[in-house]
């Protein structure tokens, strides 16, 4: 390995900013100047708990600090961004959005050029939300934001009053907007950027139709508070393309933790090394997200890593629910109804899929149940092995309030 390789430079920088990481390498007799990435320790949740999250509060000038949601452990943890981290994130996102808009404007006869003058950020808390207005202003747009905690009627009122051409939001918020507005195509939204939750292609196509736009007018992005921007969905490739400043690995689950059961042949746990992040030790960071069809492709003469979807997330508590892919369930349901908003529960080994949809007919419920059981291999196998007692698919009343998470609502409820 060259002494000036990006990996070696990043290792040395992380050792300078996180002294414990250098100690960790020394204990394992790993030479930062002469090691392969596969020799470096996996940055697991246990390692971060011991060293990063337990550290004294950092005091450097210009710091931004964000707290995790704490949904998995009940404890909110501090994650730091330096001014450099923020600047690189904002520049990368602005360029990504600019390239996407240019590409969709010239994608074909069905894609009319969009003139973006106003953009609205309507999402949860965290790094993506805090930087959205800065990114929009760099792109020359009039920008405003809205708290996700407000009643949905206020979201609709804001959209009607501000009339943004571009909406930056979360899929569950978009579901609620579509359900409450009745005629979302009248809101004048021409482009949608998504963050924070799963958005299967079937769902994206149905949402695009409701707004009177094309699927290519939706950009689904994948990121995390630890890493920042990770990937964005390419409708042309049908793949999530990983950011050029990141090196990704797709590892077997049992290599991460011997308690994890093997995944399906085309699935692996995503592990990331960022060459731009500094105040988080993003070297072989284990996301615990399970991706499918990980591969390397050539785009515009450059090799890029990509995957087809995030199927699910695994963790050390080993719930049966970790074998269940919300992505797959959403994909199946949206093959039957175009306006479905759903909540999935796993209670006492019974899987419940509760659907709110104006187009859903009662006779469809049994067909959706059959499709979930027979098209999603893991669920069918769990029922066959009596790990799951069965599936119930029910419809929600039109005015029924669906469960909402503290930030994310697209998840499996236990």
Spans of model-derived segments:
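Nucleotide 5′-phosphate-binding alpha/beta core
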Residues: 1-112, 125, 349-354, 358-414
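Active-site glycine/GP-rich loop and adjacent strand/helix microenvironment
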Residues: 2-6, 10, 142, 147-414
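Generic low-polarity alpha-helical segments
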Residues: 7-10, 14, 113-114, 118-119, ...
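Short, charge-rich amphipathic segments
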Residues: 20-30, 53-67, 81-89, 131-148, ...
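Charged, low-complexity, helix/coiled-coil-prone segments
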Residues: 30-40, 65-74, 92-100, 117-122, ...
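Active-site phosphate/ATP/adenylate-binding loop shared across adenylate-forming ligases
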Residues: 45-206, 210
